[in-house]
Amino acid sequence: MEKTIYVNRPASRTWNRLGVNEAAVHWDTDAEALLSNEGFTAVSGENAPLRIEAADGGAAYGRRVYTVTAEAGAELTVFEVCTAAQPLAAELRLTAAEGAHLRVVQLLNPTRGAVLRHELSAQLAEHAKLDLISLQLGDGAVYADHQISLAGDGAALRVDLGYLARRSDTADIDLTVEQLGKSTVSEIHASGALMERAKKVFRGTIDFKRGSAGSVGSENEIVLLLGEDAENKTVPVILCAEENVEGSHGATIGELDADTLFYFASRGIDRAAAEAILARAAVERLARMAEDE
């Protein structure tokens, strides 16, 4: 039987009245069944990309778990595609050993009315690197929880996240980066568009732990509101337990203004077409970065 569970809790809570301390999801925990649990290991000198396709398999409340390990000096690109017509939970566990480089291209794409829960965890050792490109383009509800630890000195992370939410869809994202090692670097870029009655929450937390001296972290989000009833909540947070660090965050939220509409109209493009063009532009940069159809 379905009950309410709470996911995407940030590292630091804020006022409850803001409605961003957690996401409530209707989920049948008793019916949840493990559909697959697979592991992959990359070694230095092997560069063939790994493709993961996580689907519901026709079962409601299925769960799929994937563990990817990059050994010292290895380089690996992972393409992960999650599709769901039924409620689906997927988990991707990443480990990068010393000097390893992981590049993850992720597409979260539920069909209309479906619920997709996705969890990503990553542990980066000394001088390891993770590049994450995450696209959320589905027609249903996506709850994405990314927990990344820069544990080793000199570990580096870049995240490029894009979303497009329409109708009454939900995009709920929690991204927490713990910077533990010395001279670690994190860089987060998020952008997307909300149409009609769509709702989006993005919680981006950079957490400088004691001992992370010399580390740098930044996050930025650009949101385009294309629906009068669209609802956006952006929660950038920087936590600091170390003095010699540098952190920054920012957000830009814009709408389709009269000047932009006039520009499109003068070229024979009506409002609906203009919104479609701008919504596509909000995420197509990431699609080009993905380098995979």
What does each model-identified segment do?
Residues M1-A33:
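Short, Gly/Pro- and small/polar-rich lid/capping loops
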Residues L35-F262, S266-I269, V283-R285, A290:
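Conserved beta-strand/loop scaffold segments within soluble protein domains that form the structured core
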Residues I277, A281-A282:
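Mid-to-C-terminal alpha-helical segments outside catalytic/metal-binding sites
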